[in-house]
UniProtKB/Swiss-Prot annotation:
The atypical heteromeric and topological design of the odorant receptors appears to be an insect-specific solution for odor recognition, making the OR/Orco complex an attractive target for the development of highly selective insect repellents to disrupt olfactory-mediated host-seeking behaviors of insect disease vectors. Odor-evoked OR currents are independent of known G-protein-coupled second messenger pathways. The lineage of its organism: Eukaryota, Metazoa, Ecdysozoa, Arthropoda, Hexapoda. It comes from Drosophila melanogaster. One of its GO terms (biological process) is signal transduction. Residues 56-65, 149-172, 276-280, 366-377 are extracellular. It is found in: Cell membrane. It comes from the Eukaryota. It is a multi-pass membrane protein. Its main location: membrane. This is Odorant receptor 30a. GO terms for molecular function: ionotropic olfactory receptor activity; odorant binding; olfactory receptor activity.
Length: 377
């Protein structure tokens, strides 16, 4: 009863992710914090592209502003999507909660171990991502300090007073405002990544539970085997529906992030070769590590889900199916046939997100970066 009444925000598998989203009112509540966090980012993001077009600053700061503009666009899209589809996300999280509680209440010690491992991994990833996000925020604020000219952490265009934005006291005022904005953006960008990673890790957990159930068929009596296989088929349907719902929520955003990741990494590579000081080089490397690590985690867990769903059929085949009666063998064969279609996180509703796709993207990024370097050289 205590588990059933558990607040979704308190689910251990999410760590602090949902708590941060609730605090900033992206999910579960609707208050002024949402607008305090999003409004400055939307306004600045609109002016960033104008500033890039009209900029007379050095090339390294223009390139950095391009990176920040794309990053801000990605951040704003995440925040807007959460606000617009808030109730869809909350319904999905409640579905996950019901599945999670079902596994927590299991008497099977192996399932309990699998749940603990997944929870521990999810919390670890979320903490690492938050730490890297905090380091990146510090980099945003400190990067201009090491420049040869006076610039703001984020480029922006200010109508009527744009020519005075680097003069005191305007520069100090805008610098402080942008420094305050940095952690607010981090709480919009990083928790979303952590939430999607947790969704995918839970789908992987469901795959592993199915594999365990199928490999344990030999421990059951003959009259119990058919019922267990039918349970596995029903659970597989739940798993398939879970992944489909996840794709319906995130697939178009994955396409936006696919394009943004390519643009940002290419820009950062270019920034690395034109950085003026060692300190700026270190900060750019920190940017690259953060953005690359965030994307690699997403692609890795999506790739793991892709292959874990294949392993369901392998686990079924590894059972002692030759000892079952004909009807039970047919039921098991039906489950194996259903498992031949892998469960995939889709990018734009079309392409499966996996490490092969990431490798292709990195090859394209490096080719474009090489072209930019030759032109600049």
């Amino acid at each position: 009863m205590e588990l059933k009444s558990m607040d979704p925000v308190e689910m251990p598998i999410f760590g602090s992710t949902l708590k941060l989203m609730k605090f900033w009112s992206y999910l579960f509540v609707h208050n002024w914090r949402r607008y305090v966090a999003m409004t400055p980012y939307i306004i600045i993001n609109c002016t960033q592209y104008v500033d890039i077009y009209l900029s007379t600053e050095s090339l390294d700061f223009i390139i950095r502003n391009v990176y920040l503009a794309v990053l801000f666009t990605n951040t704003v899209v995440r925040g807007v999507l959460l606000c617009v589809q808030r109730f869809s996300y909350e319904r999905f999280i409640n579905i996950l909660k019901s599945f999670y509680i079902e596994l927590l209440q299991s008497d099977d010690p192996i399932i309990n171990i699998l749940v603990k491992e997944t929870t521990r991994l999810s919390v670890l990833i979320s903490r690492i991502n938050l730490l890297m996000g905090c380091c990146t925020c510090i980099g945003f604020v400190t990067y201009p300090i090491f420049g040869s000219e006076r610039v703001l952490p984020y480029g922006m265009y200010l109508p009527t007073i744009d020519e005075y934005k680097y003069a005191s006291p305007y520069y100090e005022i805008f610098f402080v405002i942008q420094a305050i904005m940095a952690p607010m953006g981090c709480c919009m960008y990083i928790p979303y990544t952590n939430m999607v990673v947790t969704f995918t890790l839970f789908a992987i957990l469901m795959c592993r539970v199915l594999q365990h159930k199928l490999r344990s068929l030999e421990k059951l009596k003959n009259e119990q085997v058919r019922g267990e296989i039918i349970w596995c088929i029903k659970y597989q349907l739940k798993l398939s529906g879970f992944v489909d719902s996840m794709n319906a929520l995130n697939t178009h955003l994955h396409l936006v992030e696919f394009l943004c990741f390519g643009a940002m990494l290419c820009v950062l590579l270019f920034s690395l070769i034109i950085a003026q000081t060692i300190a700026q080089t270190v900060i750019v490397i920190a940017y690259m590590v953060m953005i690359f690590a965030n994307s690699v985690v997403l692609y890795y867990v999506a790739n793991e889900l892709y292959f874990q769903s294949f392993d369901i059929a392998i686990a079924a085949y590894e059972s002692n199916w030759m000892d079952f009666d004909v009807d039970t063998q047919k039921t098991l064969k039906f489950l194996i046939m259903r498992s031949q279609k892998p469960l995939a996180i889709l990018v734009g509703g079309t392409y499966p997100m996996n490490l092969k796709m990431l490798q292709s993207l990195l090859n394209a990024i490096y080719s474009f970066f090489t072209l930019l370097r030759r032109v600049y050289g």
